[in-house]
Amino acid sequence: MQDWDPDLYRQFEAERTRPATDLLAHITITSPQFISDLGCGPGNSTELLHRRFPDAQLVGIDHSQAMLASAQQRLPHCTFIEADIHQWRPSQPQNLIYANASLQWLTDHPHLFPSLLSQLAPRGVLAVQMPDNLDQPSHRAMREVAENGPWQQTLQEAGATRAKVLSANHYYDLLAPHAERVDIWRTTYYHPMPSAQAIVDWLRATGLRPYLAPLTEAMQLAFLQNYLAIIDKAYPARTDGRRLLAFPRLFIVAHAQR
């Protein structure tokens, strides 16, 4: 798959950063020494962490060279490394492992989440936020377009790139035996978008990537045209002309045992 596009991702940075801010607000530790930002992207979440904990040894981790370059330019005094989160092992037990909108791209959560929790220092915190929107009209439309067009065979596996997040009960059962406390909640954000095209532009940077990457440029344009037509109907204009994009997200904050 092609590398991520930081400029496209930042088009809706305020909306993308709001859940990161909400996740950070639920972290109660005061003076963490070691912090890792897993899937740091262009550094918007890392910047929040740096402002909150300026004295911590903070490392941003991502698999995208383009995102890491953007993050390093944004925060030249912070450390960023390229790594696969599945394979990542910190050199020190972490006081805070923070993962905003990244772990939903990874598989094998029953192994991954306990593994991340085991890499915390005593009283450390694992803080996770994941989009939980695969059943939303925006993502159902992706699958519908993929199944109805000349790209059908090419995109047979595109929908499998991102697995549906597990239930809150499942994550609790994975973490609770190894944690002092586990807090889980779900929030649905309603983003007023100026147009149906704006919704498509938002998703081009994230959810649509597995569908567009295997296609030729001409097929990408045709796919997006078909997708826009469905989005236009799925998100009708409200009284002020805007489209309301519902975006549910799952939050998990697990506190390591002492």
Curated annotation (Swiss-Prot):
It comes from the Bacteria. InterPro entries: Methyltransf_25, SAM-dependent_MTases_sf, Trans-aconitate_MeTrfase, Trans_acon_MeTrfase_C. GO terms for cellular component: cytoplasm. Its EC number is 2.1.1.144. One of its GO terms (molecular function) is trans-aconitate 2-methyltransferase activity. It catalyses: trans-aconitate + S-adenosyl-L-methionine = (E)-3-(methoxycarbonyl)pent-2-enedioate + S-adenosyl-L-homocysteine. One of its GO terms (biological process) is methylation. PANTHER family: TRANS-ACONITATE 2-METHYLTRANSFERASE, TRANS-ACONITATE 2-METHYLTRANSFERASE-RELATED. This is Trans-aconitate 2-methyltransferase. It comes from Yersinia pestis. The gene is tam.
